């Protein structure tokens, strides 16, 4: 196990008289402040948990120990602590801290009093779909208590990308907006209109689209036009059983004019994971 990471000691320093209070000594975590400054929070890779420090009480709370789903990369294969799955953010007035597990999103009480709640209702785990919050307003530091947030998704089985929406103040399945055999960027929203620009990519090319709802989209660019002059390629997901009995999967690339009656040279490439890039 790699133990060479730098440890940090964090203090809260008064802007009035310069006095300081110890938050945590010799922690492997990275410290950040909540939007209102009521809490300092961090993730500790050795315990695989999130902690908060109250600027009012000075008390440290483990706010994720009641979450029984992994909050970190379960496929980590290097001799170091796995990376955290990340956070969605904070709700208004620092009321709740939204934490990601591998698939779903949890509402945690930064004071450590209320039990964490899976606001995506376990939908992600049940459907092998990862969710990540799309921050449409870069100036906004918190999520409204009853806000309907946009989530970017990837299905780990089909490899489809897409978008869902989710009301923050309810425990319910996210609502599907769009999904398909593409990879999507995080959309950019117009300041004063319900209009979005998003990049959609596949083996056929990558283009920019405009949409009012991210479901019905109009193509803006023709960046991949030059490909028509070339014999391009296709890709498909293949699965097989390895020598140890475990199932594995990968990508099979073929020329666009592939003829199954012909023989072709084959190149095998393997390094970590590539199939999610279908």
What name fits each language-model region?
Residues 1-7, 55, 72-89, 93-95, ...:
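Short, conserved, GDST-rich strand-edge loop motifs in beta-rich repeat architectures
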Residues 3-17, 52-58, 107, 164-169, ...:
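Beta-propeller blade signature
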Residues 58-83, 119-141, 181-182, 222-236:
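Surface-exposed loop and turn segments in beta-propeller and other repeat-based domains
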Residues 31-39, 44, 88-96, 140-147, ...:
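Blade-terminus and WD-like Trp-Asp/Gly-His loop motifs, strongest in beta-propeller folds
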Residues 188-278:
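Serine-hydrolase catalytic core recognition
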Residues 19-23, 73-78, 117, 173-178:
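A short beta-strand motif characteristic of beta-propeller blades
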Residues 1-48:
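A conserved hydrophobic secondary-structure block that centers on an alpha-helix together
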Residues 2-7, 45-46, 99-100, 155-160, ...:
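Short, solvent-exposed loop/turn segments at conserved positions within beta-propeller repeat blades
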